[in-house]
Amino acid sequence: MTNRRVQNIKRKRGPVKSKKVVCDGITFASGLEKYMYVALKEAKIKADYEGCTFVLQEGFEFKNESYERQSNGKGKLVNRGCKKILPIKYTPDFISHDFIIETKGRANESFPMRWKMFKKYVNHKMSHVTLYKPQNQKECDEVVKLILIKRKRK
């Protein structure tokens, strides 16, 4: 019997492609969102699914030149300035009067920065709200328990 070394090869993951799921006539962006919805519903906790979009940074007119390659890094430098920059927006998965839930299995590359910006927004404009970010079904169940405990204390 020979000893073989097993190498852990970390494969590069591609973009997140979660499957849309329908429940109660609502189309959810992922199975985890559906799971959270069902868990909230069973606990009789009311929350709107993608009920509100927040503008984290207003759009603006960029008047300078800005020479950049395409986002894929190929091609030659092209002036991508002198145009309107769109606002940065964020739509949480579930929102209620006292909590906001963002279910996130695997985050895309822009999410961590958007989440930090949203936390700052909440800190300044919605200090009464508690944020939850479950990443699996077990954490969704824990979020429901935490919400119920917090509401009983009031």
What is the predicted role of each segment?
Residues M1-K154:
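Electrostatic, structured charged patches in enzyme active sites and in nucleic-acid/phosphate-binding
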